[in-house]
Structures are given as structure tokens and as C-alpha cells.
């Protein structure tokens, strides 16, 4: 078709004609009633079917199996079983009855493992069970074991208690060594019974003084304490009794007192063995460094002239008087021995 012929075939109609034509068509053709949608209703059975198991008429239609019209499914209310028309019968119960049976069976199965587990031995031991008593918790066993260990120790080290005494060791006199473990406690550490302390109130004070080496009679008088004194170091029997002889030079340094200050009487090794033991070996504390001794310039400048020496002497006398005045106000120092004895009084110790 050519494009030149288009205006001739398609004629534009006026608007009024279009409106009038549509109105006339609506009046001539009344609206037809709406047709209902056709549904395929479920086929209702006029009469109930007999149950293939119990021949009961108490049955009902349930649904179509697999949405197929050829497999209607029914349910029997008496035997509570389902069946499908055209299908095979199954003896497996379906529905609520099966669920009830499953619940009862599950309860019975859960109770049986619990009973079997209770009858078996538990895998882990209970922590609350009391542990058997250990031997070291029993005091009798502990004392017997301590006694055996002590006897074994002394028997291995020394062989016998008599051998220890024969060695004349320093601890053989202070500590009792025997088979009884109570005898190894030093006598000055033994506790005084409370009954004796109640009866005699002076027992506690006397025992404490005896611990320090001070007797009750000497404590009343102003005597020096026993623990401040040292044994007579001039006597050579102290060293020979301990198993060390003066003839052994390797023990000479060991026998020297390892103190930071000197003892009264000097070195015992340098004295003669036959010297009388009048000195008690009291310690001398290093108070010499605390004393303020005036230093005169005359000792340093011995070669100076006479005028300078006289001036220095006057200056030193003035400083000495000043120091004596200050010493009267301050605490004095004892230049002698720590404990005043007969030898100390003879040596001329005095307060400064």
C-alpha cells in the first residue's frame, strides 16, 4: 500500500458523532449478568465405606494422596488407621495413637539407660570421698619416724652417742644426745610448766635471767651479765679439748676470734701457755674513734720557730678548754673496758 492513499482511506470523524454512537450502543446492549467461576467441588460420598481392616462404617474421607483424584485417602475412627483406595494396606499405625506409643516407648528407653548407668561403676571418682589418713598426720607415727631419723642421722655421722661425747665437741655438753627425741632439746629452751609458774611467780623471771646467763642472786646485785663475758682464751686447754692442737698451723687462723674489735689481753696465740689466766677475755669496743682528741700543730711542724710554736700551744690550749666545756654538756664516753672488773679498775679506765 502506498503512503499517498492513506488520507483517503482513513477519514477523521467529528467528536460529536463518536460520543453519540457510544451512548446508543450502551442503551441497546444491556449488561449481561456475571457468570460464576466454576469450581470442581470435592466429591462427597453418599455412603461410608467399610474399613478394610475392621469392617467398620465409622470412616471418613480425608484427602487425595499426592493430590491425585485416583488415590482418595480414608480414615477409620475405630481402629485409627488410614488407607488409600487402590493402594496396599499398611499395618503401621498413623496418627495420634502412634505418637502416644512413641512417647511411652521413649520414656521407657530413657529410664533403662539411667538404671544401667547407675548399676555400672562411675567413670570418675567422687571428690567428696574422704582420703585415707597419711602417716605423717598421725602424731604417734610422726614421733616414731622422727626418732628413727634422728637415730639414723647420729648413727651415720658419729656412730654412737658415746663417740660424740668422746670427741669433746662444743655442742656435746650443751645438747643432750640420746635415743629419746625429747632429750635433744636444750635445757635452757625447755618451757617451765604453768603450774610451777602459778605457785612461784619468780620462776619466769629467774628462767629468763638464766637464759641470758645471769643468776637470780647476781641479778639483784649490780654485777656484769654473764653473756657479755668470753671464755678464757689464754688457756690452751680450750683448743686442745675441741680437737684442735696449737701444733697445727692450719687451725691458728681459725682459732683467732673473728670479731670486729680486739679482746682484752691481746692475741692468745702470741702468749705463753704457762701464763696465769687472770684475764677473762672481755671485749673492747672501738670507742677510740669516738673520742675527740686535740691535735697540736707542734707535732706536724716540729721544725718551726719558737714564736709560732708558742702561738700554736696557746691556740691548742684554748681549743682543748673549749672541747672540755662541750664534753661536760654532752654524753661522756668510757675509755676503759665494757665491764668493770678488778683488772679494769687497776688499768685506770675513766669517763671522758
Swiss-Prot record:
The keyword GTP-binding does not apply. It is found in: Nucleus. Keywords: DNA-binding, Metal-binding, Nucleus, Transcription, Transcription regulation, Zinc, Zinc-finger. GO terms for cellular component: nucleus. One of its GO terms (molecular function) is DNA-binding transcription factor activity. Residues 24-46, 93-136, 265-334 are annotated as: Disordered. Transmembrane segments: none annotated. Its main location: nucleus. InterPro entries: Dof, Znf_Dof. One of its GO terms (biological process) is regulation of DNA-templated transcription. Disulfide bonds: none annotated. Zn(2+) binds at residues 51, 54, 76, 79. This is Dof zinc finger protein DOF1.8. The lineage of its organism: Eukaryota, Viridiplantae, Streptophyta, Embryophyta, Tracheophyta. The gene is DOF1.8.
Amino acid at each position: 500500500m502506498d503512503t499517498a492513499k492513506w488520507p483517503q482511506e482513513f477519514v477523521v470523524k467529528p467528536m460529536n458523532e463518536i460520543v453519540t454512537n457510544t451512548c446508543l450502543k450502551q442503551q441497546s446492549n444491556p449488561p449481561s449478568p456475571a457468570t460464576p467461576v466454576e469450581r470442581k467441588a470435592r466429591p462427597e460420598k453418599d455412603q461410608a465405606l467399610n474399613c478394610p481392616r475392621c469392617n467398620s462404617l465409622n470412616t471418613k474421607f480425608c484427602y487425595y494422596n499426592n493430590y491425585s483424584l485416583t488415590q482418595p485417602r480414608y480414615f477409620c475412627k475405630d481402629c485409627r488407621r488410614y488407607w488409600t483406595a487402590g493402594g496396599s494396606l499398611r499395618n503401621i499405625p498413623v496418627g495420634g495413637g502412634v505418637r502416644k506409643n512413641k512417647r511411652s516407648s521413649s520414656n521407657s528407653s530413657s529410664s533403662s539407660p539411667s538404671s544401667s548407668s547407675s548399676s555400672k561403676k562411675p567413670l570418675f571418682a567422687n571428690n567428696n570421698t574422704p582420703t585415707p589418713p597419711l602417716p605423717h598426720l598421725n602424731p604417734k607415727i610422726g614421733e616414731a619416724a622422727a626418732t628413727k631419723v634422728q637415730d639414723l642421722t647420729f648413727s651415720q655421722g658419729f656412730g654412737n652417742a658415746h663417740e660424740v661425747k668422746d670427741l669433746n665437741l662444743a655442742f656435746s655438753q650443751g645438747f643432750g644426745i640420746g635415743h629419746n627425741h625429747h632429750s635433744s632439746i636444750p635445757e635452757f629452751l625447755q618451757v617451765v610448766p604453768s603450774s610451777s609458774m602459778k605457785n612461784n611467780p619468780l620462776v619466769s623471771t629467774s628462767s629468763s635471767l638464766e637464759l641470758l646467763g645471769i643468776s637470780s642472786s647476781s641479778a639483784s646485785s649490780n654485777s656484769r651479765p654473764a653473756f657479755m663475758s668470753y671464755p678464757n682464751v689464754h688457756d690452751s686447754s680450750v683448743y686442745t679439748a675441741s680437737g684442735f692442737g696449737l701444733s697445727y698451723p692450719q687451725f691458728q687462723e681459725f682459732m683467732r676470734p673473728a670479731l670486729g674489735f680486739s679482746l682484752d689481753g691481746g692475741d692468745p696465740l702470741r702468749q705463753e701457755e704457762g701464763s696465769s689466766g687472770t684475764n677473762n677475755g672481755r671485749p673492747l669496743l672501738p670507742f677510740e674513734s669516738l673520742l675527740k682528741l686535740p691535735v697540736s700543730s707542734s707535732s706536724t711542724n716540729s721544725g718551726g720557730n719558737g714564736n709560732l710554736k708558742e702561738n700554736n700551744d696557746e691556740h691548742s690550749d684554748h681549743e682543748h678548754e673549749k672541747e672540755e666545756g662541750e664534753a661536760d654538756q654532752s654524753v661522756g664516753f668510757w675509755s676503759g673496758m665494757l665491764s668493770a672488773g678488778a683488772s679494769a679498775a687497776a688499768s685506770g679506765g675513766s669517763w671522758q
